[in-house]
Amino acid sequence: MQKQEKIIEMFNQIAPTYDKANRILSFGVDVSWRKKACKRVLELCEENTLNIVDVACGTGDMIEIWQESVQKAHKNIKHIRGIDPSSQMLKEARKKFKNVEFIEAGAQDLPLESESVDILSISYGIRNVVERQRALGEFARVLKKGGILLVLEFAKRERGGFIAFFRDFYLKNILPSLGGFISKNKEAYAYLPNSIEEFLSKEEFSTELQSVGFKNVDFKSFSFGVSSMFIARKNDR
């Protein structure tokens, strides 16, 4: 089994307990990160009627927050879609959202028309994409000229100190055990800290975004650098 297929199967296995585990393991603070990110994107977006796509949507956390955030921003959603390669994650998402289109597909091969999307988001999923540059190229392809990409991701540690020590201890010792207890799949939650450390630095990821056609990469960290937000705009030429 290829690495990407193994990752997808892992998410299939933990899908039934995914929402519960997320809220407990992040102490619920991931919802705050998502809301702040959506609010910032909508402040930057000039369009009032939006076509939004959430890639690696999982059980639909970002779908719900996009719906709430767009309403608060006094804008409208023309079409919102969730895309994920995990059939079991989408099964859970469809239970929660009856009027949202969910598509089973990978980030590296989006079944969407070119230049058809105003906002594309991917939250805590890009590090799980094996063909990352191909996926970023797909994001650029489907976004309209001037469209906005939002990437939320756990940050690779770049400095020391007490916060970094506590973060590493939690990720390597507490999270795998607690996540494994909730999901009955410790291996899946042991994968998380390893995937974070193998991901790019913010400078490296910003360079990758620019290399496939994005500009004005805006970066912000949350909760002492635990989570990172990247907002980039597709070149309009």
Predicted features along the sequence, with ranges:
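C-terminal alpha-helical "lid/dimerization" subdomain adjacent to the S-adenosyl-L-methionine
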Residues: K6, P85, L152-E208, V212, ...
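Conserved alpha-helix/loop element of class I SAM-dependent methyltransferases that forms part
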Residues: G28-T49, I65, S69
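A short acidic, Gly/Pro-enriched loop at the edge of an enzyme's catalytic core
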Residues: Q108-I119
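N-terminal, positively charged/glycine-rich alpha-helical extensions of SAM-dependent methyltransferases
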Residues: M1-D19, I182
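Class I SAM-dependent methyltransferase SAM/SAH-binding core
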Residues: N51-D109
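Core SAM-dependent methyltransferase catalytic element
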Residues: S206, V212-R237
